A protein has these predicted regions:
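Residue-level signal for functionally critical sites in structured catalytic/ligand-binding pockets
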Residues: 1, 11-15, 41, 165-172, ...
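Primarily membrane-embedded glycan-assembly and transfer machineries that use lipid-linked glycans
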Residues: 1-19, 25, 50-157, 201-260
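Voltage-sensor/pore transmembrane module of 6-TM cation channels
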Residues: 21, 25-54
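Membrane-water interface signatures at transmembrane helix termini and the short loops
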Residues: 38, 45-47, 136-187
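Secondary-structure boundary/capping residues
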Residues: 43, 59-60, 188
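C-terminal hydrophobic structural anchor segments
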Residues: 176, 181-204
Length: 260
């Protein structure tokens, strides 16, 4: 942990690389903020975004910039007359990430599909448990891969999310793929191809069947998602807990030189 004096010094007298990255940090934060306006789940990528920046000031600037679009979007609701000021709490509850705020539709993926026999379940208990597991896995990944390359941290967070999420959106299967392609692990492509094949069966083949028949086929398909879990776990960057020295950016090298 930084002493208060050192913390203030890095803010007021940043390294050249940190100062040069400030402009890009603003744009990166604003883009992340726009993503949060569309969906609240990108918040799990914010730690990796901050790790990609070279210094304390650029990270703080990016974090503040990330909060600007959601705040402006939220304030536009009562200002534009679409929502009363007194109803903002209800809006926050509807879009929040607290376990009690998440829609409790489960049974499409993983462990909740096994619990429900592949049927949709409106019981909020599995959804709450899953949310707590996701948050715990996020903290665990940030600790276990704290010295890893930021992309590897992102891979770990997103794959852990896939293991513990109580519900499934088709877009979830796409989140980790660009990062695994950019920095593939040994089991990256088996995990990618397995998820693609599983999704193709569910979204391209099963949807050709009429209602009742689709519903009966959906059950074994949802439960079969558990077969992908060994591939997802194997695809985690287990051997890359520490970033390679040769791959370190000049900015990070400069920070390390100053510390020494």
């Amino acid at each position: 942990w930084l002493r208060p004096g050192e913390f203030l010094r890095r803010l007021t007298h940043p390294l050249e690389a940190d100062r040069a990255a400030t402009g890009r940090a603003v744009w990166a934060g604003l883009l992340m903020g726009l993503a949060l306006c569309a969906k609240s789940w990108p918040v799990i990528l914010v730690p990796a975004l901050l790790m990609l920046l070279p210094g304390l000031r650029s990270r703080l600037v990016s974090l503040v910039a990330t909060g600007v679009p959601p705040v402006l979007f939220l304030l536009s609701l009562p200002i534009g007359g679409w929502t009363k000021w007194s109803e903002l709490d209800d809006v926050l509850n509807a879009i929040g990430l607290r376990p009690s705020d998440v829609r409790p539709i489960t049974g499409d993926w993983g462990w909740t599909a096994l619990l429900s026999g592949g049927e949709w379940n409106l019981d909020p208990t599995p959804a709450r448990i899953g949310q707590y597991l996701i948050y715990a896995s996020l903290v665990a990944c940030l600790i276990w891969w704290r010295k890893a390359h930021p992309v590897d941290v992102t891979i770990a967070i997103l794959l852990a999310f896939m293991i513990f999420t109580p519900r499934l959106g088709a877009q979830y299967l796409l989140w980790f793929m660009p990062f695994l392609v950019a920095r593939p692990t040994r089991w990256a492509w088996p995990a990618i191809l397995g998820c693609c094949l599983w999704a193709a069966v569910g979204y391209l083949v099963l949807t050709q069947f009429p209602g009742e028949q689709w519903y009966e086929l959906h059950k074994p398909w949802a439960m079969s998602s558990i077969v992908l879990f060994p591939l997802i776990i194997a695809a985690l960057p287990w051997s890359r807990r520490q970033a390679e020295a040769a791959a370190a950016s000049p900015a990070h090298a400069q920070v390390g030189e100053e510390i020494r």
